[in-house]
Regions:
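Class I SAM-dependent transferase core
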Residues: 2-68, 72, 104-118
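Acidic, metal-associated active-site segment
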Residues: 57, 80-83
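Short, charge-rich binding segments
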Residues: 63-65, 87-91
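Conserved beta-strand elements of the Class I
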Residues: 72-74, 135
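Class I SAM-dependent methyltransferase "Motif I" SAM/SAH-binding loop
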Residues: 75-79
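S-adenosylmethionine
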Residues: 82-84, 91-156
Length: 156
């Protein structure tokens, strides 16, 4: 599935607006550029980034109640799914919290947030943070048992 097909799905089925699509395009550009120097995503998935990473992350917006206060993305890595959700987010009172222990990835996440003028916040290793969240998401973070354990510790 190519970029244009994914964008069509994002607009029609998931209600992404044109502003969000433009931010996603810039986000993809930033990920691919940074991936030349640091392993943010597997090189083998670069050509399928729109389907494998963007659409896979974006499908979560159907299940998120943006009237709640916050969402935590555990092991955010390159920002999937947290930054995709933040790009979609239209509620200024809804906060996306990105948890990432890698200093390189934390720096990248902060750069994306600044360049795209997003409201997400970056935190360090989830084990060292005392934060709460209404919704917890993750993608390729840990084994399910560990995800549940960490979720219990930070969920409201």
């Amino acid at each position: 599935m190519q970029q244009l097909e994914v964008i069509s799905i994002l607009k029609k089925d998931l209600n992404f607006n044109e502003r969000s699509i433009e931010k996603l395009k810039k986000f993809v550009e930033l990920v691919l550029n940074e991936n030349k120097n640091h392993n943010l995503i597997a090189k083998s998935t670069e050509s399928s980034i729109w389907h494998r990473h963007i659409l896979d992350s974006a499908q979560l917006v159907k299940f998120i109640d943006f009237k709640l206060a916050s969402l935590a993305d555990l092991g955010s890595g390159a920002g999937f799914p947290g930054l995709v959700i933040e790009i979609f987010n239209k509620n200024k009172d809804f906060h996306v919290k990105l948890f990432e222990k890698s200093p390189v990835k934390k720096q990248f996440l902060s750069k994306v947030i600044k360049e795209l003028d997003l409201g997400a916040e970056v935190y360090g290793d989830v084990r060292n943070e005392v934060l709460d969240a209404d919704i917890i998401v993750c993608r390729a973070f840990k084994k399910l048992e560990r995800v549940i354990q960490v979720s219990r510790e930070i969920a409201k």
